[in-house]
Amino acid sequence: MNPIVSILNRVNVPKKDKYRILSFPTHESYQTNLAETGHEFILFNRGGGNKIWEEKYKPLPKNTHIFNAITDTEYDIDFVLSQERFGQIQFAQEISKSLRIPIIHLEHIEPQLNNWPQEQFDHMRSFKADINVFITEHNQKSWGINDSVVVKHGIRTDDFNGWTGPADGDVKYVLYIVNGLESRDQFCGFTEWSAVKEKVEKIDPSIKFALVGENPGVSQPISNEKILVSSINKCACYINTSRLSPVPMSLMEAMSCGAPCVSSAKQEIPKIMQNDDVCTNDLDQMAAQIVKICNDKEYAVKIGSHCRNQIVNNYNIGDFVNAWNKIFDLAHEIRIGRVI
């Protein structure tokens, strides 16, 4: 058995009610879900052009704070959570050494094996933490770090709920929530989205495509979650054309709402959706499914119900919180020296 998984199953050191966890602004949606654990998160703003928290994407949770300087003496930090390998984990290692606290590393991305030389991949892979966490099994295998654990995404299914589709007489729109769709084509699939849009509009010109997110000159992000959920709940269909996102959280939130979703079949998405009719890399099939969903409410409800059930049963926030709390308890155990 994976030693990390084995240890997680037997953590029994007295736990703290609340940990103070030092991390960095990385992924607003994921951090918002991490805040559901109830612990205190101190996000260190490294400056120098590094990622900052974007309020336009998500408001800062109440138990999450931004600081420009931090000391263990002042804040009694329990451990550090790193979330990327492009400078963050290296910085976390310096903090770990200075403050003598464990590192948890959470890996969000897939290695770009087609673009990285082998030496670069080997170098990036060499950075490891006391506890290494991946968001999918595919992600874990791609990096080849076996001494690690997988934590599946969790969605707040009570908050992301209530799809009805457009009211009679309203425009039938196909929604995609994405930032930088055109500029991040290799990640988000602007080419595929444009092709599907053209195919759908040729079949049924009454169907429109809408974007939410930071797309200059086209759309803006929605930080108010209730308004965001309302946008999902009123769409006729949700589309995702991502190529390199292991787990597109916006897709999962739309699925949780019960919106009928059509997506590319990349990375972990087929495993999440479990429906080859609407999860495909065939652009003609994607277009045909969108047209059918937009014009057949009974079919749309069927697809949407399946989408929601997949999230409720397999990716709920309760399981996510429990998994992370086990990891935090293990990090605490490592810190006090009972597991090395």
Briefly describe each language-model feature range:
Residues 275-284, 292-297:
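Conserved acidic donor-binding segment of nucleotide-sugar-dependent glycosyltransferases
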Residues 142, 156-218:
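Conserved catalytic-core segment of nucleotide-activated headgroup transferases in glycan assembly
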Residues 243:
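Aromatic "clamp/platform" in nucleotide-sugar-dependent glycosyltransferases that forms part
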Residues 229, 251-256, 267-270:
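Short alpha-helical segment that forms part of, or immediately flanks, the ligand-binding pocket
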Residues 265-279:
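Short acidic/histidine- and often glycine-rich active-site loop of Leloir-type glycosyltransferases
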Residues 238-239:
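A short hydrophobic beta-strand element within the catalytic core of glycosyltransferases
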Residues 259-263:
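Short hydrophobic beta-strand element within catalytic cores of glycosyltransferases
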Residues 295-339:
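A charged, aromatic-enriched C-terminal amphipathic alpha-helix characteristic of glycosyltransferases
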